[in-house]
Design a protein with these regions (language model features):
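FabD-like malonyl-/acyl-CoA
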Residues: 1-141, 192, 269-287, 291-303
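Alpha/beta catalytic cores of group-transfer enzymes, especially the acyltransferase/condensing modules
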Residues: 10-12, 37-39, 100-251
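Non-catalytic positions within long, well-ordered alpha-helices that form the structural scaffold/packing
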Residues: 77, 182, 263-266
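A short, acidic, amphipathic alpha-helical segment used as a generic capping/interface helix at domain edges
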Residues: 250-267
Length: 312
């Protein structure tokens, strides 16, 4: 068996996530509490109850998701379950790097909190958006974006799986590209409930802020390979983690390529770490049954996974 950990991104968060894991697994609780200490708000309250309704805001979503990942990773590590490879969708990449020992999970939470604030600040005051495009190939959608460029910035920002791409940019240009995509044969275009054009050139100021932040961070060597969003594969010898993370926030997430690369590397089993099962769905659509993917969000799912892994 070759195992990959896949860390979820923004969009699958919900109030109550991680609460039963926190109450059931001491290792989850300890790692979660340590991670929560890295931010300037009550992270546990936002994750478990979200009374103020802020969990959907990116500056809160990102560190909350990362703390959840820290807890689950700690339980798996305690049980002797560690991956051969790791990858994470968007903000999940920080958790993947922490799992690989590049920095600790508390640093990952602090960095994703900073990243969330930088992305929110970059998006503020701009009329931007993102739209999922279903049932159209990459080449055709790229042509639609090029034709809509007279309305403003628009580009493909997520390459999720076959038949599911996401475009982002200035709203008028995104709307125009979506109309052209429907005319070109797209099955549906679904506007996403997000506050900015993430993973597009419009996030350049956030990339600049991250580059400056990274100057104070020590990046240790990876204990195992991480596949990077902006590449769709492992880093090259002349790449640096800091440069790739800076690039990631302002360029497309190549998730389908990442999943296909995992199969080339011999991965046959994956654990989705995060609320929901979005990545499990993407894996299934990209490579079918070549990778058995186990989503883990609840204590019951984790107990079942531990039994499965011990029997493997």
């Amino acid at each position: 068996m070759k195992l990959a950990f896949l860390y979820a991104g923004q969009g699958s968060q919900h109030a109550g996530m991680g609460q039963d894991l926190y109450e059931t697994f001491p290792a989850f609780r300890a790692a979660f509490d340590e991670a929560a200490a890295a931010v300037d708000f009550d992270l546990k309250e936002v994750c478990f109850t979200d009374a103020a309704g802020v969990l959907k805001e990116t500056q809160y979503t990102q560190p909350c998701m990362t703390a959840f990942a820290a807890g689950l990773t700690a339980v798996l590590r305690e049980q002797g379950i560690m991956p051969d490879y790791a990858a994470g969708l968007s903000l999940g990449e920080y958790s993947a790097l922490a799992c690989a020992g590049v920095f600790d999970m508390q640093t990952a939470v602090a960095l994703t909190a900073f990243r969330g604030k930088a992305m929110a600040a970059t998006a503020a005051g701009r009329t931007c958006g993102m739209t999922a495009v279903l049932g159209l190939d990459e080449t055709s959608l790229q042509a639609c974006c090029s034709a809509a460029a007279e309305e403003g910035v628009v580009q493909i920002c997520n390459y999720n799986c076959p038949g599911q791409l996401v475009i982002g940019g200035e709203k008028a240009a995104v709307d125009k590209a979506a109309d052209l995509a429907l005319a070109a044969g797209a099955r549906r275009c679904l506007p996403l409930n997000v506050s900015g054009a993430f993973h597009t050139l419009l996030m350049h100021p956030a990339g600049d802020a991250l580059r400056e932040k990274f100057q104070s961070i020590h990046f240790a060597p990876m204990q195992f390979p991480v596949l990077f969003n902006c590449l769709g594969h492992e880093m090259a010898q002349n790449d640096t983690v800091a440069t790739l993370l800076e690039k990631q926030v302002q360029s497309g997430v190549r998730w389908e390529a990442t999943v296909r690369r995992l199969t080339e590397l011999g991965v046959d089993t994956a654990i989705e770490i995060g609320p929901g099962r979005v990545l499990t769905g993407f894996v299934k659509k990209a490579v079918g049954n070549a990778i058995s993917c186990y989503p883990v969000e609840t204590a019951a799912q984790l107990q079942q996974l531990l039994c499965t892994m011990k029997g493997a």
